[in-house]
Amino acid sequence: MITADLKGKKALVTGAASGIGLGTARLFASLGATVALNDLPGDPRLDEAVDKLRAEGRDVLAAPGNVGEAESARVMVRSAAEAIGGLDYLVNNAGTPGTRRPIPPADLDAQSEAFWQRLLSVNLIGPFRCVHAAAPYLKAARGAVVNTASISGFGGGGSSSVYCATKAGLINLTKEWARALGPEVRVNAIAPGLVESAWECRFPEDDIRAGLARAPLKRVGTPDDYAEAILYLCAGASYVTGHTLVVDGGLSA
């Protein structure tokens, strides 16, 4: 396990009620950071996560808000930054597959205009909204942004063609934001493969087994695996920006 001294650092993690987001918030808080955990308003898992981390002695707070809605995202980011006294790190982890089952690329009828708009608003425009609102705080702190993309953003194969397109766009925006916000702010991304979490979209077990058979490390990645990569890009990697780090156990090797 990699480690760092994050005492005095301030972080906002979106999509932090479960999975990679919660793993990241837990790791950062355990290393001394003050962490604002964001997820959808009314999601009971958000309050449960905050309560559990506080019981462990961590300095955390809930920052409910919908990154898929412009005003909600803006208010959430600014309120969180003011509440914790600034922002050193923004982790854009919130995202949605928008479907409970994978949609084959040929099933164009299932990929409606409304489906496109929802995924674009959450997965692609959502991170932009958060970066836009957080930029003044991050520049003042000479901070860092990490976006959660996906290996499907490189070669497809995700929950839908639409999802893959949004993650490909986020990989591209990671480069654009690195140029736009440097030298004060570094912007990177991770591209996860298989994740051990209760994700909204469930892939067939045969597909998961086939993926594991191809992957050199032969296991599904845990939220902690991805959190360590995010920690590296936030607290280390001082000469790395505009990069998307593939974290998939070798699945795409």
Model regions and ranges:
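Residue(s) in the substrate-gating loop at a strand-loop-helix junction
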Residues: 150
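Short, small/polar-rich loop/turn modules that mediate ligand/substrate recognition or access, typified
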Residues: 182-186, 240-242
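Alpha-helical segment proximal to the catalytic Tyr-Lys
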Residues: 136, 178-183
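Active-site helix of classical SDR
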Residues: 131, 166, 174
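Catalytic Tyr-X3-Lys loop
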Residues: 96, 109-128, 146, 163, ...
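Canonical Rossmann dinucleotide-binding motif of NAD(H)/NADP(H)-dependent dehydrogenases/reductases
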Residues: 4-36
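C-terminal substrate-recognition "lid" of short-chain dehydrogenase/reductases
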Residues: 84, 131, 137-139, 219-247, ...
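Substrate-binding pocket helix/loop in short-chain dehydrogenase/reductase
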Residues: 101-117, 200, 211
